[in-house]
C-alpha cells in the first residue's frame, strides 16, 4: 500500500549526501519538495532531522537511540520496572515479542528492545518512517548498543498493521500509542514535540487499529492513552495500568481470554 503524498521542504546541509539523493530517497516514500511548507526535512552530516522553519527556537526532531534522553533512560531508567515493560507483560524471564504499530520516534520500543524483547516497528507517516530508519541505521553501527538493536529492533517496510498477516506476522503483544488531541497545557510542556505534532496531527482513524491489533496479538494488545482520553473504539479493556499522566489499557488476546 502506497503512502499518501506529503509535501515538505527538502534541504541538504550535508557534505556527503546531496539534495538530489535526499529527493530521490523521499520520492520512494511519496514525499515531495514543497517550498511553501513551514516544515523541512533536513539532511545534515550527522543525521536526518525535521525542523519547523517558522519557529526556529523549537528544537529539531530526530531519532537518537545512542545519546541524550534515550541513553539516560537506558542507563538510569527503570528497565523492567518501567511502566511500559510491566504493561506488555515482562516478568521474570518472560520477554514477549512485540509489534509497535504506531512507532513514532521509537522511544518505548527502544526501552523494550534494550530489555531484551524482539520488537518490530510499523510507522504510518512516511517522514517519521525515514527519521526512524535513519536513527536505527546509526544506532546499528554503535559499538555499545548496535548488536542488541540489530537483534531486537527492526523497522518493517509496511505502513499499517492491516498489511500484516495474522497467520505469519503475529506477536505476543501489539502496542498502540496513537497521537491524541492534546490539551493546550500539555502540548506546551515539551516544545520540541510541537514540531512532530504539526507534522503528524492526531490519529483520527486510531480506532481502526484495534481490530487488526487484536488479530495479530497472541497474548495482549496494549494501548497507551492520556489519562483523560476515552477508550479506543469505546471498548472497555480487560484492565488498565495507570501512571502519572497516562494509562495503559490492556486487552487480552484470544489465547488468553
UniProtKB/Swiss-Prot annotation:
GO terms for cellular component: cytoplasm. Keywords: Cytoplasm, Methyltransferase, rRNA processing, S-adenosyl-L-methionine, Transferase. The keyword Methyltransferase applies. Its EC number is 2.1.1.242. It comes from the Bacteria. InterPro entries: 16SrRNA_methylTrfase_J, SAM-dependent_MTases_sf. This is Ribosomal RNA small subunit methyltransferase J. It comes from Haemophilus influenzae (strain PittGG). The lineage of its organism: Bacteria, Pseudomonadati, Pseudomonadota, Gammaproteobacteria, Pasteurellales.
Amino acid at each position: 500500500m502506497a503512502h499518501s503524498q506529503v509535501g515538505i521542504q527538502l534541504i541538504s546541509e550535508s557534505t556527503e549526501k546531496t539534495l538530489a539523493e535526499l529527493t530521490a530517497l523521499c520520492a520512494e516514500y511519496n514525499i515531495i519538495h514543497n517550498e511553501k511548507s513551514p516544515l523541512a526535512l533536513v539532511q545534515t552530516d550527522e543525521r536526518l532531522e525535521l525542523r519547523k522553519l517558522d519557529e526556529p527556537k523549537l528544537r529539531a526532531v530526530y531519532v537518537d537511540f545512542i545519546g541524550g534522553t534515550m541513553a539516560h533512560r537506558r542507563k538510569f531508567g527503570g528497565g523492567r520496572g518501567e511502566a511500559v515493560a510491566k504493561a506488555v507483560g515482562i516478568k521474570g524471564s518472560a520477554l514477549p515479542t512485540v509489534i509497535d504499530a504506531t512507532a513514532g520516534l521509537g522511544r518505548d520500543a527502544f526501552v523494550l528492545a534494550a530489555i531484551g524483547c524482539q520488537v518490530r516497528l510499523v510507522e504510518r507517516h512516511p517522514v517519521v518512517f525515514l527519521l526512524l530508519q535513519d536513527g536505527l541505521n546509526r544506532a546499528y553501527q554503535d559499538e555499545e548498543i548496535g548488536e542488541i538493536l540489530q537483534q531486537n529492533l527492526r523497522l518493517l517496510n509496511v505502513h499499517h498493521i492491516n498489511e500484516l498477516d495474522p497467520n505469519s506476522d503475529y506477536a505476543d503483544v501489539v502496542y498502540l500509542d496513537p497521537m491524541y488531541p492534546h490539551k493546550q497545557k500539555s502540548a506546551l510542556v515539551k516544545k520540541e514535540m510541537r514540531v512532530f505534532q504539526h507534522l503528524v496531527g492526531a490519529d483520527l482513524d486510531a480506532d481502526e487499529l484495534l481490530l487488526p491489533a487484536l488479530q495479530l496479538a497472541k497474548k495482549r494488545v496494549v494501548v497507551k492513552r492520556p489519562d483523560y482520553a476515552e477508550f479506543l473504539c469505546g471498548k472497555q479493556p480487560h484492565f488498565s495500568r495507570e501512571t502519572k499522566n497516562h494509562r495503559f489499557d490492556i486487552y487480552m488476546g484470544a489465547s488468553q481470554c
